[in-house]
Structures are given as structure tokens and as C-alpha cells.
A protein has these predicted regions:
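PLP-dependent class I/II
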Residues: 1-199
Length: 199
């Protein structure tokens, strides 16, 4: 209901990040279908950002938006991806997108200026052709990093961590500790405060 209330007549697109950045939530097929059908009903195009799609923790499954069993929902979407997260190759200027909808594709071609990097094209091809074995070793390493952080945080009084289902990010909540030592007031007194809206 909250999501639907934010879909005004001025809303023309919705970005669905899967896995979600920064929380690491991996969307279920049912949730994606619900979001997709709601967007279709409201004539809102789904922009599916799947840049973290390969980085999913054990016990969770990534569902590509374009694989959903409702053709109308899929046709109302554009999927985006890149090698930057999976293969740690940010800056290659070689992200890509696709859609099953020829009308959306035509609109994109009309307004999108392609800006590929030659090095990025080579890196993309090399990563996808030869990087699977490397990434098969990285995935459990990243999962273990999450477990190390979660174990360490579990021993810290007043501190918690959101257990991510995907991505390599960990979000640690220090708010109880910060409040208990009045850190905000301390930062102001010492001239180290930043506007909260930056975070």
C-alpha cells in the first residue's frame, strides 16, 4: 500500500535494484511479480538494476526480472547490468541494458547516446568468457566475509548488523551506542558534525 501511494501520475519509471543496493535484499519472484503488475497497471516502466545479480549469498536465489512468467510485466521493463560488481571492474564504461519491448527499445535508441570504452568491451568479453572459475572462488570468500562481520558484531553490545542476502556490503547499526555516549552532541562540541541528510 505504501509503494502504491507513492505512484503518482507524475511517476513514469521505477528502479528495482535486485539484489537491492545497499541493503542486500534479494527480491523473490512473487515480490517482483507484484511490483511488476502494479507498475504495469499504473503505466510505470520498471528499470531493473541487476548489477549485483551474481553476488547472492548461500540459501538465496536471484530472479532476473526478464525471467518472470508474465510477458506483459517483462515487456514493461528494461534490465541493466555490468561487469563492475561481479568482476570488480568499475570504471570500464561498459554497462549494458536490454528489453523485450521494441517500443521501449526504440525510445531508448532515440534518446540514448552510446559511449563505450574499447578497453571496457575487451574487459567485458574476457570477464564473461574466462571469469567464471575465478568468481566461483570469490562467492564463498564474500559469504565468509559476511559471516565474519556478523559473528564479530554479535559480540558487540548495542550493535547490530542487517544480514544481507546479496551484495558484498554489510550495514552495521551503531545507533544505540551513539545515543548512549551522546555522540551527536560530542561531535557538535568538537566541530566535527555533518548534516545528517548526507547519510
Amino acid at each position: 500500500a505504501d509503494l502504491e501511494s507513492k505512484m503518482t501520475p507524475d511517476t513514469h519509471a521505477m528502479i528495482v535494484c535486485n539484489p537491492q543496493n545497499p541493503t542486500g535484499n534479494v527480491w523473490s519472484k512473487e515480490d517482483l511479480l507484484r511490483i511488476g503488475r502494479l507498475c504495469l497497471e499504473k503505466q510505470i516502466v520498471v528499470l531493473s538494476d541487476e548489477i549485483h545479480s551474481d553476488i547472492v549469498r548461500d540459501g538465496h536465489s536471484y530472479v532476473p526480472f526478464a525471467s518472470l512468467p508474465d510477458k506483459a510485466v517483462v515487456d514493461n521493463s528494461i534490465t541493466f547490468n555490468a561487469i563492475s560488481k561481479t568482476f570488480n571492474l568499475a570504471g570500464m564504461k561498459n554497462a549494458y541494458f536490454f528489453t523485450t519491448n521494441p517500443v521501449l527499445l526504440s525510445r531508448i535508441k532515440q534518446h540514448h547516446r552510446g559511449d563505450l570504452s574499447t578497453l571496457g568491451v575487451v574487459a567485458n568479453e574476457a570477464a564473461y568468457r574466462h571469469g567464471a572459475q575465478w568468481f566461483d572462488q570469490v562467492r564463498p570468500y564474500l559469504d565468509n566475509n559476511h559471516k565474519i562481520v556478523e559473528s564479530a558484531v554479535a559480540k558487540m553490545p548495542g550493535v547490530s548488523v542487517t544480514k544481507a542476502q546479496g551484495t558484498y556490503l554489510s550495514w552495521i547499526n551503531f545507533s544505540s551506542v551513539i545515543e548512549s555516549v551522546d555522540a551527536s552532541e560530542m561531535a557538535i562540541r568538537n566541530g566535527k558534525a555533518s548534516p545528517e541528510h548526507y547519510f
